[in-house]
């Protein structure tokens, strides 16, 4: 079609116009054909209502009918089969198609039989084949040995660490030692863990234990030996190491972690491939639940200092994509108004996907919503557990058995077992900030001579983890368990105890040491077979605590202790036999207490019935209990897919409000003894891990590909915007191809293929990273606004100088919540800027103090640190990192600089997005004077009408992302009604305090046209933005 055709043009024919006249007079002047009109949906929607056009349409379609009928059948076959042959021979053009295009021709119902008949002039329909991809699931061994070679006496060379599967070679791996930027980019790529399935566990041996050679404790032994020999032998020997060989010669292992700042114990830091992503997926939600925040604080709270390290581990989008099993299509939305106001996971009460920034005032509601969804999801998962139909052997007559024994077995029923396992599993899956307790109002507890009460109390202490119970519950359970064994003494015995007249107790030596040896052997075995977990330093680690052993928390531990890890990321069905040892331990422990209970009755001269009765119950059908335990575990595994689940924490976390309990999971008092005696049943379906994951029930995976592209691009943008990130926005703009390669590499970790072609993934990533994303300001709703200042903008007749010598103040610590610019009434022509008060001298750290500071740990000077090289351009992030290492309560780093301002005039009232700008920090080795430059800072202004005349004002809705505040210094004029105040360095400016109840005040305009800018611009860089 011609480009000169008017927009919305509809070629309507005349009433008596012929087909030839219509084509020559109406269509040809716009370079249109009749087929073009038929294939245009907008035109046909209007012309189908025109009778004159419909007559011409019928005439056009019947015009060539005889020629089509006379054509031979061979020609017809050639016409139909020709596109198929071309499609098989040359499928490549399909990838280059820009989008899915389906051309549809609107026809009458009478002409429906004509659809399959090809016409000579009709263009071929172009249908772009969408890229179909699927999630990449690799296979990985659960355990790999540590290989090393000992030469030169005790000198050790490590050939394999056993953690190579955790690291993938990124596009920057080869040059990571030559370019510091590539080292940081390689580390960033390795934070995205590849999903993997560990190899299946072997079958247990005849004793019910899985062979120890297949678990991490053997790896720990290698690491311990390696660490000990390495620390003793290699201390003063320096050898050359080939960077590409993978061999490591080291004199003392301090950490095997892949991430800096993590101070981990060596033999506790080994994790199976892909495991970490599942654990860290919950951390973002946990931050909303556990930590208290300081609104608008001058120095960030400890959790905010660690935010940059925590964010790197949080990839809930990918974790959810790997674990999702729902046929519902995922809707990909992209709101241009909140492009950059995104975190990896910003929570609200409705969903876990990307949403606008949550304000601090909403943190409590966010926490409640997240916890409620966690409790609800966990309860729904465990609801499939049902009561057992197992029949118990009960006392048949009351002639031999006492009435209270018969009553005890009458009260021992199956339903409490199912209720107990439902609530216990719900607590373990989603019990964050919830309390686990036992119902102490059961009617059985009201009877003082109940036989079942002490047995049920003992069963609760045997089955449950007492560290999860409150002290009051534990005291009550112990009291009820021991109540039959005291309180029956004589008055004389009580008096003797009160007068300290207690007989001396003589401890006899243990006659048989085999029992002691057995206990020691069991203790050692339990220690060696614990699941590996990382014990990290809270001051330097990315997360305060990562206890893999109890996250997710599991109520039952199978033989070997490593089976839970394979269950969560494994590829075979759960082995019930692995729980036989623990099931047997539960039975033996309960029988020991029952025998002790019967022994007391025998000493009192009473008949004993409990031991024989419980022995018959627990020994009949011995497989029922470990099958029931397996059902509980299988149900929990089935439900662990949901990202809503937040497991309980193991121990106190700094900053956590552990006293704030929002939910209670109350177990029935007889639930534990009922579970040991009856077991449970499962109404849920059989569960085969990864079966549905291999075939995602979606009509097309192309939306998933688009969604992943946006998420990966957002990850890179967030890392660049983070002051503690590994690269900056300037790095991205200068090295665009490298960052697009990085995004593609990360996507290929999760997807088997990406969209190629001219308009494929690479094209879209370039748009997301460098074309379509802009910084948008958010609304100022931060507490503490009364402490801010309002800088008056009196700019009538001001001409901005191009180069200005001034100072830059770089804020060291970010505030908890950003302070942004606000204009609630866009129709007004007056604008104001909020700025913080300039800090005192003792809060300012000079740049020269940073570069000349020598660290107490013996580190080298600034000029010799491994991150800095002569002539390198430093960004703001590096200055902040160096400033944080210097003791003292400093808030800003002062840098003498020269600023270049770029005035930008706004011609209309629409919002304009600020372009990025850079602040280059440069130095020369050996020169004390540091020189820095801030270039091309956009300063937006517009000419507005005020009292009938034009006036130059700043537009503050479009300031850059770093919230650079430009204070324009004016000459003092008492007639304006404002007294000048000193901001810093003798600079005088117009400042007035903003009331906490009012966001904006009416600005007062300078009516003197001769008012000019006297001195320079004071540049305050305050990185409140994203």
Curated annotation (Swiss-Prot):
One CC-aspect GO term: viral inner capsid
Primary localization class, coarse: virion
UniProt keyword Ribonucleoprotein, yes or no: no
Location within or outside the cell: Virion
Region annotated Disordered, chain positions: 60-96
Role according to the record: Self-assembles to form an icosahedral capsid with a pseudo T=2 symmetry, about 60 nm in diameter, and consisting of 120 VP3 subunits. The capsid encapsulates the genomic RNA.
Protein's UniProt name: Major inner capsid protein VP3
Gene coding for it: S3
